[in-house]
Amino acid sequence: MSNGTPSVRVLYFASARTTIGHSSETISLPTTPFPLASLITLIANKYSSRGAEAVLRTCRWSVDNTLIEIDELIEWTLHGREEVAAIPPVSGG
């Protein structure tokens, strides 16, 4: 984030972390504002060889600890410095 390019920190949990291969990363935004849905597509494309799209499609997403509704993914825009989390479905027993 220090190079002046807007970026976000993305956290991956559970199966998303396993698929992506690490628990977090910083991603530069190509433009701002940048739709959250476009960030998800960018990540899916970056890790397409690992089958990321299938896992990311099932995730809930949060931005700065606010859960984003599925129908808001296109409307929700990122401007840089946000913390975005990919949260796969969980179950208990």
Swiss-Prot record:
Asked if Transport is a keyword of the record, the answer is no
**GO BP term (any one):** Mo-molybdopterin cofactor biosynthetic process
Q: Which residues carry this modification: 1-thioglycine?
A: 93
Q: Which GO terms describe its cellular component?
A: molybdopterin adenylyltransferase complex; molybdopterin synthase complex
UniProt keywords (A-Z) are:
Cytoplasm, Molybdenum cofactor biosynthesis, Nucleotide-binding, Phosphoprotein
Residues bearing the modification Glycyl adenylate: 93
The annotated pathway is:
Cofactor biosynthesis; molybdopterin biosynthesis
UniProt xrefs under InterPro entries = Beta-grasp_dom_sf, MOCS2A, MOCS2A_euk, Mopterin_synth/thiamin_S_b
Name where it mostly resides.
cytoplasm
Question: What family does the database annotate?
Answer: Belongs to the MoaD family. MOCS2A subfamily.
UniProt name for this protein:
Molybdopterin synthase sulfur carrier subunit
Q: Which organism is it from?
A: Mycosarcoma maydis (Corn smut fungus)
